[in-house]
């Protein structure tokens, strides 16, 4: 259950994993692309999860049609703008929208720096028009290797003053964190914060690596942390947040069932964990679903959900004054 008098945040929300089916159809036709289907319901199983996928990589393939229709920078701008509208429609007060410009640019050879600028423009316009607050997190897609990630980081850093953090996402097993230590030295030099997808497809060691070698202050998913009690204690003691995505973890087969999800164990250890969507359009869910449907399946109590909602603002990459402004706004509702 969502408490209206508290700010609602979504800190782990992929902009390029949230492209509307209608937009995929519209842009596909605009650019004359061969789509697997040409009406919404026939296209849905190609771009949205209809049952759990066998792996993270299989899940990620559902995102491919969304970025395949990004035929020019205006399309990127449109998708970014629509993402802000979707967040508003989901009752979200503050969203951190993350995106991989290399992945968005890849199909149509768009300039990476141009994609970054288009996304910034689209999100800023959306925030003006829809009256919600959003910030951007740039992703390096480890799936494509070290060189591609360097190109991606170079593009992201052209707009570093418009970003709050850098993330490492993609094939965690095939491209481990130690390959990207030099990339994150540059992130530190740029004075950007770090969140890393870790402990999703690989084990607790991947999370230690993200924290100790890459400088992560938040971890995306992190479900494998429960295999290492010392890591759990470290997360709690050092205030390292876990961006939890319940439905996503089921759909990627990262976790076998809602009942076995480790989010309750995080809370028991005093780890700051928050609730997020991940890829809403691909999953066919929104943030209220996670609070009202997924969380009760996990067995979270109303008091635990309240703490999770509070954690979402505490962990946000915002200044204390920005957080306080959101608290005051929500308290008046």
From Swiss-Prot:
A Pfam entry, by short name: A_deaminase
Annotated GO biological process: adenosine catabolic process; hypoxanthine salvage; inosine biosynthetic process; nucleotide metabolic process; purine ribonucleoside monophosphate biosynthetic process
Keyword Hydrolase: yes
Keywords linked to the UniProt accession: Hydrolase, Metal-binding, Nucleotide metabolism, Zinc
Annotated Gene Ontology cellular component terms: cytosol
Active site as annotated: 200 (proton donor)
Coiled coil: none
Record-level Gene Ontology MF annotations: 2'-deoxyadenosine deaminase activity; adenosine deaminase activity; zinc ion binding
Chain sites annotated for binding substrate: 14, 16, 170, 279
Annotated site residues (Important for catalytic activity) in this chain: 221
Cofactor: Zn(2+)
Stored InterPro entries: A_deaminase (IPR028893), A_deaminase_dom (IPR001365), Ado/ade_deaminase (IPR006330), Metal_Hydrolase (IPR032466)
EC code: 3.5.4.4
Residue numbers binding Zn(2+): 12, 14, 197, 278
Note describing how the cofactor binds: Binds 1 zinc ion per subunit.
Reactions it catalyzes: adenosine + H2O + H(+) = inosine + NH4(+); 2'-deoxyadenosine + H2O + H(+) = 2'-deoxyinosine + NH4(+)
NCBIfam families, alphabetized: aden_deam, PRK09358.1-1
PANTHER family reported for this sequence: ADENOSINE DEAMINASE
Family indicated by similarity: Belongs to the metallo-dependent hydrolases superfamily. Adenosine and AMP deaminases family. Adenosine deaminase subfamily.
HAMAP family membership: A_deaminase
Described purpose of this protein according to its UniProt entry: Catalyzes the hydrolytic deamination of adenosine and 2-deoxyadenosine.
Protein name: Adenosine deaminase
Record organism: Aliivibrio fischeri (strain ATCC 700601 / ES114)
